[in-house]
Amino acid sequence: RGMGSRVTASHTTAMGSYDNAYCFKLFRLLKMSGINFVSCPTESIHLQGRFDSFPKRRGVTRVAELDRAGMNVCLGQDSIKDPWYPLGNGNILRVLDAGLHICHMMGFEDLQRCLDLVTDNSARTLNLGEGYGIAVGRPANLVILDADSDYEAVRRQAKGRVSIRGGKVLMTRVPERVEFTAA
């Protein structure tokens, strides 16, 4: 009781196999609880259902449905080059790209705010509160991406231009330049 936002359910892959009627009832209770959800879509799509005969389960939780129902859901990766997901590399934009595909979140509204799944929603899951965001008095921890929108950041897998931690610049990147020669 009263734990609410201090509780996070990770993976919740079984939810992808529940029928809609059950999920409708479950979502009401989950929303009232105020808990957070973290999905690791690259790991889930790899691990879940791999030994099923056809049709195979997708094995990923209902990210889009949780989000649209007003619950806090974020994406992550908990396997970095290990037996559970050997291609894990910690690149959160790659996870987001895969997650948007896997979770059928290619609609206009989803793409306009997709970075929330790996930024704002993640900060809410971690209960960072006043320790997160850009405002006077808050720690200056941020990465500036070489993109002008969430959509472009994911579509182009934008690289960080500047990384700042505690107000100190840790890294800057000069944009890549490609020159074509006449054939």
Where are these regions (language model features)?
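Short low-complexity, flexible loop/linker segments enriched in glycine and/or proline
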Residues: 52-56, 89-92, 160-162
